[in-house]
Regions:
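Extended, compositionally biased alpha-helical segments that mediate assembly or anchoring
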Residues: 1-74, 287-381
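Extended oligomerization regions of viral-like shell subunits
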Residues: 46, 220-336
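Assembly/oligomerization interface modules of large self-assembling protein complexes
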Residues: 64-151
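Long, contiguous amphipathic alpha-helices that act as assembly "spine/axial" helices in icosahedral shell
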Residues: 135-207, 356-359
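Solvent-exposed, low-complexity, repeat-rich "mucin-like" stalks and linkers
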Residues: 385-414
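Short, well-ordered beta-strand segments
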Residues: 411-426
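Low-complexity "stalk/linker" and mucin-like segments enriched in Ser/Thr/Pro/Ala/Gly
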Residues: 422-437
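A short beta-strand micro-motif common to beta-rich folds, especially ectodomain repeats
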Residues: 444-457
């Protein structure tokens, strides 16, 4: 089950004002029996800073009072402020993160293909008891992103916070902002890496455009965007990696242009290309600085994914190729990302009188191969070669062999291939879409040829010769 936290009043942050700070402090006190017993009727008054200092003196007198206040304050900030800011104030979170996975550490993405029509025949045999199995595709997405952030607040920091209402605000923001902003930035970088990785892997349909050096090319780009947006509304298999039939309504599309491309083309012109009002277009647009990583982002990415087994660094050639990408155009459900755990914890070290605060951010960060996805680039997709491994092998009757195809491509061309086997005499000799060869136990042929044919360019193929020894 996936849930998304919501705020009743729609507020998105804590105001830095005496009235707001006094209300926050009093709310923490009212929710704690320990603090109510310690403070009695003493409460913060936004018009009287001395009331805050009185509270601070009581809280600082015993560790249990101080801890009770900090835990209460942190729970409020963590459950209300941060969750709400995280969901509502960040465009990437709001438009790509689906919610929170409450049970288990994986989720299955299931796609049921459209039913195939059959000709009606009033005089034909009854098919009432015939079994028509649905064509079902599925993919599992697992917990693959576990990060934590830490900040330390000293006893001195806590004392100074109660000298003024702005001091309380500064204490909260010092803890919250640094960790929250770090988590938010890292999520953006993880999504950006996912886009960059999958663009280079050739899983998106390529729309080749000219460089935006003049008005004519800009107009042609807008025409291309409009054409793709319109085509997405019609069921087809051309824009999905899995080859399933899908469609995407305009309001369910996400258009991710580079900042410089958006500035050059113009937001109003892009809105017209989508045939949407300006406000509606803002709902489908997602901003990105560039598809290549800046030096600062490169450093952060290296830290973020250090020792991560699922991280495949971009090669220099792949980084250079990303400079040619103007925009990505996807179904809003192409990103398959959700929270698994987004929680705060605190711990006080009695030996140093310092309080450590921790933010744990665990996520599933993935994508759906069943959703439409298009990349706009100045490059043209080209297949250079297809090589099958192993090139030769001996496989006995009734045995199996896993083959692989290495596709050398440029321009983000699809690296998918179709497999077939030639020379077989047995119907039991087959090869799966993933290249698993099964030799039938009744096979009489002594030699088979396995071919891998590029789906992007059928003139490019590779082959392997398989010897079937006689028993």
């Amino acid at each position: 089950m996936i849930t998304q936290p919501l705020m009743k009043d729609g507020s998105t942050g804590i105001k830095n004002s005496p009235t707001a700070m006094a209300a926050m402090v009093n709310d923490v006190i009212e929710k704690s029996d320990v603090l109510k017993n310690a403070l009695g009727d003493t409460r913060a008054n936004g018009e009287d800073p001395s009331s805050l200092r009185q509270i601070g003196q009581v809280l600082d007198s015993l560790p249990k009072y101080r801890n009770a206040f900090q835990v209460g304050l942190w729970n409020m900030v963590g459950m209300i402020l941060v969750n709400n800011m995280y969901w509502k104030n960040d465009e990437w979170v709001r438009k790509t993160l689906k919610g929170t996975l409450e049970v288990g550490d994986s989720i299955e993405d299931i796609w049921v293909e459209v039913a195939t029509p059959e000709q009606y025949n009033a005089n034909g045999a009854s098919t009432l008891t015939d079994f028509k199995k649905a064509d079902i595709l599925s993919r599992f997405h697992v917990l693959n992103y576990q990060k934590k952030y830490q900040r330390t607040v000293s006893r001195k920091d806590f004392r100074q916070a109660f000298f003024s209402f702005s001091g309380v605000y500064d204490l909260v923001m010092r803890i919250v902002d640094t960790m929250y902003n770090g988590a938010r930035w890292d999520y953006f970088l993880a999504c950006k890496y996912l886009l960059a990785r999958k663009i280079n892997d050739g899983v998106m349909k390529v729309a080749t455009v000219e460089d935006l050096t003049n008005t004519e090319n800009i107009q042609d780009f807008l025409i291309q965007v409009q054409s793709v947006s319109n085509d997405m509304e019609f069921p087809d298999e051309e824009m999905t990696e899995a080859g399933n039939i899908n469609s995407t309504a305009k309001t369910d599309q996400l258009f991710i242009p580079r900042n410089d491309v958006q500035a050059k083309v113009g937001v109003k012109a892009l809105a017209n290309a989508f045939n949407l009002e300006y406000a509606e277009y803002r709902g489908v647009e997602l901003k990105i600085n560039k598809f290549q990583f800046t030096p600062t982002e490169e450093k952060r990415l290296a830290i973020l994914f250090a020792n991560d087994p699922g991280y495949v660094p971009l090669t220099e050639e792949e980084k250079t190729a990303l400079n040619s990408v103007f925009a990505v155009h996807i179904d809003k459900d192409w990103f398959f990302c959700m929270n698994y755990l987004f929680e705060f914890y605190e711990f006080e070290d009695p030996s140093t009188l310092k309080e450590n605060f921790f933010l744990h951010d665990w996520k599933v960060i993935s994508y759906s191969p069943f959703r439409n996805a298009v990349v706009y680039t100045t490059q043209s997709p080209t297949i250079t070669s297809v090589t099958v491994t192993p090139a030769t092998a001996s496989v006995g009757k009734g045995a199996q062999l896993q083959l692989s195809a290495e596709v050398v491509a440029t321009g983000f061309a699809s690296k998918k291939v179709s497999w077939n086997v030639k020379g077989a005499t047995s119907d039991a000799t087959t090869i799966t879409p993933n290249g698993l060869l099964v030799v039938g136990s009744d096979e009489t042929a002594t030699s088979l040829t396995v071919e891998a044919i590029s789906l992007a360019d059928s003139s490019k193929n590779g082959s392997a010769t398989i010897t079937v020894p006689s028993l």
